[in-house]
Swiss-Prot record:
GO terms assigned for molecular function: G protein-coupled receptor activity; peptide binding; protein-hormone receptor activity
Mod. after translation: Phosphorylated on the C-terminal cytoplasmic tail.
The family this protein is said to belong to: Belongs to the G-protein coupled receptor 1 family.
Membrane topology annotation: Multi-pass membrane protein
Record gene name: GNRHR2
Annotated source species: Callithrix jacchus
Annotated keywords: Cell membrane, Disulfide bond, G-protein coupled receptor, Glycoprotein, Membrane, Phosphoprotein, Receptor, Transducer, Transmembrane, Transmembrane helix
Disulfide bonds: C113-C188
A GO CC term assigned to this protein in UniProt: plasma membrane
Protein name, per record: Gonadotropin-releasing hormone II receptor
Database matches in InterPro entries: GPCR_Rhodpsn, GPCR_Rhodpsn_7TM, GphnRH_fam_rcpt
PANTHER family for the chain: GONADOTROPIN-RELEASING HORMONE II RECEPTOR-RELATED, NEUROPEPTIDE RECEPTOR-RELATED G-PROTEIN COUPLED RECEPTOR
């Protein structure tokens, strides 16, 4: 994450540059607060302000009391959790990254080193797992609209629980490492936690799979199933459904445009996740398998790619804001359509009632005429 911290979870080949042993330690070049790092800090501050404001606004919008006539949407609950994860990234990862680049070395002590590395990875796990939950929810909403939605809470709990458990190793791997001379220097690193190089590489690959590869695969499967399900002939033909099921399905799908917006929103969340983090993780893989490339790749490239990854946190509330505005317009159109349908229904009922009254009057008149003809004529 910083000049000495090249991956999102902190373990990097860069640590070996200054935290080695013997002659490497004495002759290594210590990191400095370079011009590229200064630009990175400035951009991080801008991202922090925009992400904090946007995600706090999303939380306020989702948690405020809603009109009684509107049923709470599952999408709102899901984006409340996504906003919470983005806020965790905002208030842990961004300030930590900016401060660490300014101080260059670690000045907060061993306990803060372990705790902040744990919180940082937990925040990034949550921000990666919650879009998967959104994809699973959209898959259930599209492919099985009549099914129960109670499983969403379990999925949300599993996402947060896994984020906590998978980040726990950070508490034991990271610690402060001190360098006595020629210039005293302290850093938060994994130096000495791995007995062999392959162990560190295995841990990095495992974290990479859990942070990026597995969530990306799960989301790709979800949206592929949605596309296949929507395009299948069975889904398009509604005439084969029983009458009762068709009526119930209409009651669930009375807002198709809102459902379509929710699906588009989930797809945009997936696309932003891919676009923001793919370049940085690919660079991390390059570092792990070819540490010599550290001297060939300019540090500014690592700065740019990580800032591009942090852009994901302020983008999510913008997507939700666009979705909310679209839903409000949809609700207005829906209310207008409902009022028109209600007026048409009342006019139809009035016409039916008038026709019935006319038929009744005709029947009464014809009966009276028949009774008059049946009266016998007597002579006086």
């Amino acid at each position: 994450m910083s000049a000495v911290n090249g991956t999102p979870w902190g373990s990097s080949a860069r640590e070996e540059v200054w935290a080695g042993s013997g002659v490497e330690v004495e002759g290594s070049e210590l990191p400095t607060f370079s011009t590229a790092a200064k630009v990175r800090v400035g951009v991080t501050i801008v991202l922090f302000v925009s992400s904090a404001g946007g995600n706090l606004a999303v939380l306020w919008s989702v948690t405020r009391p809603q009109p009684s006539q509107l049923r709470p949407s599952p999408v709102r609950r899901l984006f409340a959790h996504l906003a919470a994860a983005d806020l965790l990234v905002t208030f842990v990862v961004m300030p930590l990254d900016a401060t660490w680049n300014i101080t260059v070395q670690w000045l907060a002590g061993d306990i803060a080193c372990r705790t902040l590395m744990f919180l940082k990875l937990m925040a990034m796990y949550a921000a990666a797992f919650l879009p998967v939950v959104i994809g699973l929810d959209r898959q259930a909403a599209v492919l099985n609209p009549l099914g129960s939605r109670s499983g969403v809470r379990k999925l949300l709990g599993a996402a947060w629980g896994l984020s906590f458990l998978l980040a726990l190793p950070q508490l034991f791997l990271f610690h402060t490492v001190h360098r006595a001379g020629p210039v005293p220097f302290t850093q938060c690193a994994t130096k000495g936690s791995f007995k062999a190089r392959w162990q560190e590489t295995t841990y990095n690959l495992f974290t990479f799979c859990c942070l990026f590869l597995l969530p990306l695969t799960a989301m790709a499967i979800c949206y592929s199933r949605i596309v296949l399900g929507v395009s299948s002939p069975r889904t398009r033909k509604g005439s084969h459904a029983p009458a009762g099921e068709f009526a119930l399905r209409r009651s669930f799908d009375n807002r198709p445009r809102v459902r379509l917006r929710a699906l588009r929103l989930a797809l945009l969340v997936l696309l932003t996740f891919i676009l923001c983090w793919t370049p940085y993780y690919l660079l991390g893989l390059w570092y792990w398998f070819s540490p010599s490339m550290l001297s060939e790749v300019p540090p500014s490239l690592s700065h740019i790619l990580f800032l591009f990854g942090l852009l994901n946190a302020p983008l999510d509330p913008l997507l939700y804001g666009a979705f909310t505005l679209g839903c409000r317009r949809g609700h207005q159109e829906l209310s207008m359509d409902s009022s028109r349908e209600e007026g048409s229904r009342r006019m139809f009922q009035q016409d039916i009632q008038a026709l019935r009254q006319t038929e009744v009057q005709k029947t009464v008149t014809s009966r009276k005429a028949g009774e008059t003809k049946d009266i016998p004529i007597t002579s006086i």
